[in-house]
Amino acid sequence: MEIIRITRILDGRCRGSSRPVIVETPTGKHLIKLRGAAQGSGALVSEIIVAELAEALHLPVLPRRLAILDSDTPTEDKNDELADLLAASAGLNLAFPLLDNARDATKKDFFRLTLGEKAAILWLDRLVLNPDRTNQNPNILYSEEQLYLIDHGASLRFQYNWSNITEETPSYVGSMFKPHIFEMVSEYPDWVHWESLFAQCLTRSVLERALAAVPSSFIYPLLPDTILDNSLETLENNIQRRKAAYVAFLWKRLKFPRNFALEPPIYQEMNTSKIQHKRLTNQ
């Protein structure tokens, strides 16, 4: 993945929990997802992996670059919260090009997607446990007659709970808070045929390439503290083992029968005090 250097922070206004910023680079303006944001580097790992898998399914996503943020990168925004965020994000971050005239897509724009493309989007989001593509927030961008899938940082939730993963965990259906914007596509007669074709596109080598695109510095903060004190060589070996664990999890999830595709998702109950989690089991 190409590496660019951030030369100036142009806009640091808060834009959701991921708190991306708009920056200037030698190749133009970019939107940067920061490693120091609330979701941490795990969100950047998810963004890269899901985008790589989307491209393997011929779905439109934005090109990605790695962006170096120096501790002395100039900014005219003197907000203390932003300053803390930038300080916590020194080093490599994830960059997306800032598109001209981009806006959030609406239902009126979705005619540009074929039924098969809608099915592929639904299938991919179920595979990677992406809860963020709903009627309220489609996370689809429109620019210059083109749609792009965006914001996959909340996917791959299993990466925060490796110690509780069992042999059966990858076969769990998965849970969502709200229905997917294209949920009804799974009721079409062709769904079973489509989902089989999608699975054939995601070979083990595709999964391995997706993980190879993830920088070690994004995996490092996700390792247990007991591992971090090892030598650099041992640490790199542990990072590669963790990448292999992502591949193994997704590969097992892709094995037939794919419950995530053939069974409806489990919906979690939300209230203002806490989230009541239903167990992710096959029902």
Feature roles, as predicted:
Residues 1-283:
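Phosphate/dinucleotide-binding and metal-coordinating scaffold of catalytic cores
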